[in-house]
UniProtKB/Swiss-Prot annotation:
Family, similarity comment: Belongs to the AP2/ERF transcription factor family. ERF subfamily.
Classification via CDD domains: AP2
Biased composition (Low complexity): 7-16
UniProt entry tagged with the keyword Transcription regulation: yes
Keywords: Activator, DNA-binding, Nucleus, Stress response, Transcription, Transcription regulation
Segments of this protein annotated with the region Disordered: 1-45, 134-161
Protein's UniProt name: Dehydration-responsive element-binding protein 1F
Pfam families assigned: AP2 (PF00847)
Species annotation: Oryza sativa subsp. indica
Membrane-crossing segments per the record: none
Amino acid sequence: MDTEDTSSASSSSVSPPSSPGGGHHHRLPPKRRAGRKKFRETRHPVYRGVRARAGGSRWVCEVREPQAQARIWLGTYPTPEMAARAHDVAAIALRGERGAELNFPDSPSTLPRARTASPEDIRLAAAQAAELYRRPPPPLALPEDPQEGTSGGGATATSGRPAAVFVDEDAIFDMPGLIDDMARGMMLTPPAIGRSLDDWAAIDDDDDHYHMDYKLWMD
């Protein structure tokens, strides 16, 4: 009886050997590096170290330190050109002008230089370089009609054109009085004729003398 129990227990404890091809092995998918896909989708197609943010309305820049995994954040800029200039300043500060891969290789001499290779000095020089290439704002469009605006009382606002000035010529030249003087003068006998009325009356009316009717000048 004991022999049977011992044999049954030993047989149950021994598991049958598994065949080489019968086992199931679950393979884990390869680990993906976090953030690389987003980096590829947002980086600028031309400029180094420049990525888009906020749907492409803003551009950020960062550079990797040599012999290190750390990155230096250089800021956010309104245009990719400004971010690219900031990258060039940082690249020159970290790798030197000859060893740096620049976005604008023809203009390193026009960029400000960082005092040291510390992240603070690099960020300061990068911001200064970006400001040198900030685009000026577009000019404001002037309204076609400058009288569109109205004042608080509802009256039309005056434009920059000078207002028409009324000149009273009658008041300046005293036209009413001048006309009265002319009228009175027409009713008087001219001085030259008044002195020689007797002589004119004595002149005979013939072909050799000119006859003048001076009754027009008499009252």
